[in-house]
Amino acid sequence: MPNTAKKHREALAKIDRSRTYPLVEGIESVKSAAYAKFDETVEVAVRLGVDPRHADQMVRGAVVLPNGLGKDVRVLVFAKGEKEKEAREAGADYVGAEDLVTKIQEGWFEFDTAIATPDMMGVVGKIGKLLGPRGLMPNPKVGTVTFDVGRAVKESKAGKVEFRVEKAGIVHAPVGKVSFDADKLKENLLALVEALLKAKPSAAKGTYVKKISISSTMGPGLNLDISDVQAKLV
């Protein structure tokens, strides 16, 4: 524990919390400050000028990160017949229907994302209270309720990230691992920001993107220069 505390202090010393960092410098600083023995996830927090208590200011969506997440995503699909076959051929880890519902009711959650064909939602609805709080409930707004299960599976495997604004108006999302080079993390972060801009509610007034911060799982966070980030969007 003392050794961990020392490493954290050393990591904090590498970050100037009083300034905002240009995008690339910020990413490189987060990479250099990471100290855990495992490959830490690089996480982004974006504070938006919305009040999610109002339905017309909810921000929700998904984006396929161009360089993936650096981890194996376990995909579960609720489907039958030809769609079951399509899901398996696309690389889904688990495919089924009522049998999977039973396993989940018994406490099994060994998967990272769930996809369902629309005709299966009546079955999936039985476990909505189990999947919902874990962020695993299939939803048409993020493309996980669809008949195009092959595409949905491939996107999830490739590094699809779902995002949803929280009560404080903040969106949290992973953009890769500290082992990624800075350019790959930059491309992933820009893809996320672009998706957030596209998801801007028409009811949102004033400044939309108020703050962007980045950190690793164990390391300290820092604030990015919003104007520099937006200038790099294609």
From Swiss-Prot:
Gene Ontology BP annotations = regulation of translation; translation
Taxonomically, the superkingdom here is Bacteria
Give the molecular function GO annotations: rRNA binding; structural constituent of ribosome; tRNA binding
Q: Which Pfam families match?
A: Ribosomal_L1 (PF00687)
Q: Which UniProt keywords apply?
A: Repressor, Ribonucleoprotein, Ribosomal protein, RNA-binding, rRNA-binding, Translation regulation, tRNA-binding
Q: Which residue ranges traverse the bilayer?
A: none
Q: Name one GO cellular component term.
A: cytosolic large ribosomal subunit
| Stretches assigned to coiled coil | none
Role played? Binds directly to 23S rRNA. The L1 stalk is quite mobile in the ribosome, and is involved in E site tRNA release. Protein L1 is also a translational repressor protein, it controls the translation of the L11 operon by binding to its mRNA.
Oligomeric state and interaction partners are given as: Part of the 50S ribosomal subunit.
Protein family per UniProt: Belongs to the universal ribosomal protein uL1 family.
Name of the protein: Large ribosomal subunit protein uL1
The gene from which this protein is expressed is rplA
